[in-house]
């Protein structure tokens, strides 16, 4: 979340078209500093994830580059809006999917375990999961360069800084081999790498 916050502050300093949207979670998603520094480009729509996504679609149609920051478990509330309002039209909306995966102390309602399943079937949507903080930064740079929607899912807690010697350019549809062996294959996504 801190890495995302820093990426947003740096990006918004460089690009006036980038706006941030929260659904009553600016502190939890790392957008409170964005709200303070860029109050005219930060929107908190309240507990209304569906509205957050439709609002982002409208802003994208108007020329903005919206970033919708939501907890994974609450993003599923906006399934129809993601599909119909953003993905079918291939609008340039970035979804910052916070608390993806198991989140322990947040309780059973906050486990972000369905986002890969429902986001991966969306047309025109690129879904990514960084293995470390450098890759998270690179994925947001990649997302802002795209003409269509991108979802970046990341776990709660401190960002992992290991495996930085494996830094490569972000390419869609590519996996990364960390170690090669002959007996078994271990497949991991995001912070589990």
Predicted regions, residues:
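Glycine-rich phosphate/diphosphate-binding loop of Rossmann-like nucleotide-binding domains
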Residues: 185-193
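Short, small-residue-rich loop/turn micro-motifs
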Residues: 24, 154-156, 190
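A generic structural signal for well-ordered coil/turn residues at beta-strand boundaries
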Residues: 146-148, 171, 180-183
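Conserved hydrophobic/aromatic pocket- or pore-lining residues that grip, position, or stack substrates
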Residues: 20, 152, 186
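Aromatic-enriched
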Residues: 158-176
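A short, charged/proline- and glycine-enriched loop
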Residues: 14-18, 179-184
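Thiamine diphosphate
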Residues: 1-149, 158
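Short boundary motifs at domain starts and secondary-structure transition points
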Residues: 9-10, 175-179
């Amino acid at each position: 979340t801190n890495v995302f916050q820093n990426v947003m502050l740096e990006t918004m300093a460089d690009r006036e078209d980038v706006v941030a949207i929260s659904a009553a979670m600016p502190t939890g998603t790392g957008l409170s500093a964005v709200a303070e520094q860029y109050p005219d480009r930060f929107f908190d729509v309240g507990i209304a994830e569906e509205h957050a996504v439709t609002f982002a679609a409208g802003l994208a149609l108007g020329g903005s580059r919206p970033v919708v920051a939501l907890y994974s478990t609450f993003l599923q509330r906006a399934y129809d809006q993601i599909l119909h309002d953003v993905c079918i039209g291939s609008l340039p909306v970035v979804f910052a999917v916070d608390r993806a995966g198991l989140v322990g102390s947040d309780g059973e309602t906050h486990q972000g375990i369905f986002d890969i399943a429902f986001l991966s079937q969306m047309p025109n949507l690129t879904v990514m999961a960084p293995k470390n903080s450098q890759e998270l930064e690179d994925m947001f740079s990649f997302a802002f360069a795209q003409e269509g929607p991108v979802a970046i899912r990341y776990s709660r807690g401190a960002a992992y800084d290991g495996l930085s010697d494996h830094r490569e350019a972000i390419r869609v549809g590519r996996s990364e081999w960390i170690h090669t062996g002959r007996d078994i294959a271990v497949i991991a996504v995001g912070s589990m790498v």
